[in-house]
Amino acid sequence: MRSYRTTRRAVGLLAAAALGTGLLSACASDDDDGSKSDSGDGGSGKTTITMGLFGTFGFEEAGLYDEYEKLNPDITIKQDVIERNENYYPALLNHLTSNSGLADVQAIEVANIAEVVDTQADRFMDLGKVDGASEDAFLDWKWQQATADDGKTIGLGTDVGPMAVCYRKDHFEAAGLPTDREEVAELWAGDWEKFLDAGRDFKENGPEGVAWVDSADAVYDGAIASSEGKYYDEAGEVIYKDSPDVEAAWGIASTAAEEKLTGNLEQFTKQWDQAMSNGDFATISCPAWMLGYIQEKGGTKAEGKWDVAQSPRPGNWGGSFLGVPESGPNKDEAAKLVAWLTAPEQQAKLFAERGNFPSAPPAYDMEAVRTATNPYFGDAPIGELFSASAEEIPVQTIGPKDQVIDDNIGNGLQLIEQGKQDPDGAWDEAVKAVDNALDQ
């Protein structure tokens, strides 16, 4: 599978499972088509603000729409949800190009934000100038991702995906590895090579039939997410072939595949879901939203067996934005709504109810975030853990075709896991596929 919310790497943002008592994963389930989907006002005379979304952002489920309507009695909010970003995003581009059929508010996934900023910025309002929206309230790199060279900010961040590693305590114990989350984090602190070393120990001493990690692709995702560089330079040139960060992440992931430390699974497939349910792997790269997915697939039989530790290095995987098209009939009111929905207070409420990790650092000191724990994961202090990770995430240059490059690198890693190519041959195949996709 290529995409649910954006691709297999972003699909977890759709997972709709409880994160402890009331906490759910970021952007929840792709089964929800939105109960507030019509855009009429029924003759009430109220201003109806339409929200064009993909997946489930959780605003309605967390009660934020109802709260805003009570604060603003002349406003009605209706959302129109397309389940998968692979269907939503092409339609959004078509509407932007024709300048018709747009909702008052349109969501943009992080994998697409660079392309929208580069090619469609003139179609959106500058939300940096809207009352209630402050650059200082957001992570700097998150704000910059949606800001054009001329300083126009076309979207406000809804969430981010700070990284951790989720691990099975029962499997670690059986392999003679520590199970305390702080001691576990020390196994690989600061270095993904140490993560492989722990995996080698696990392979030698762990339970038969249990892989160290689910997939080489997930190892790569974690490693590249924690790197300074990625696929483009600041001038917008594609540099992945010569990037030392990509080379290092590929080296870590391809080694994991070649040494058979992985479960040879493709994330967000039925086979992967079943393996998670059965406990067939011991670790997984774990952004905040992944916790809910693990809980959903692990069910009651895995409760208390999983825990969460800091990743080898801080990184980010996931996150979205809300933008306001210039052609919208209610753009001023829509901009006010977007500023309110993405304010730290609302982001903290959304985390408490749905698990979407805030892109606004002021929310990290709020009790709903700061004291959050997850009973399913042994009362892991997820608010504290993910806040610390979020504040240390490296700033990466996001390019317009990051997802295309990412997908084809993942396909190359699968060739190694399947025994079809060695790492050098798999890299060559990945490069050919990327170059074809980019017409190079």
Residue ranges with predicted function:
Residues V81-L92, V110-A111, W188-K194, N264-N278:
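Short helix-initiation/N-cap motifs at beta->coil->alpha
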Residues E266, G378-A430:
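C-terminal capping/gating helix-and-loop segments adjacent to ligand/active sites or protein-protein/ligand interfaces
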Residues G128-F138, E182-A189, G229-A248, E296-K301, ...:
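Short, solvent-exposed loop/beta-turn-alpha elements that line the ligand-binding surface or hinge
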Residues R2-A114, G132, T179, P329-E333, ...:
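Conserved N-terminal structural module of periplasmic/extracytoplasmic solute-binding proteins
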Residues A114-T119, W143-E183, S215-A235, W317-V324, ...:
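Periplasmic solute-binding protein
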Residues E109-A164, E303-D307, T373:
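Hinge/lid segment of periplasmic solute-binding proteins
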Residues E258-E259, K297-P358:
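Extracytoplasmic/periplasmic substrate-recognition and gating elements
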Residues L196-G199, A235-E266:
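Glycine-centered hinge/linker elements that transmit conformational signals in sensory
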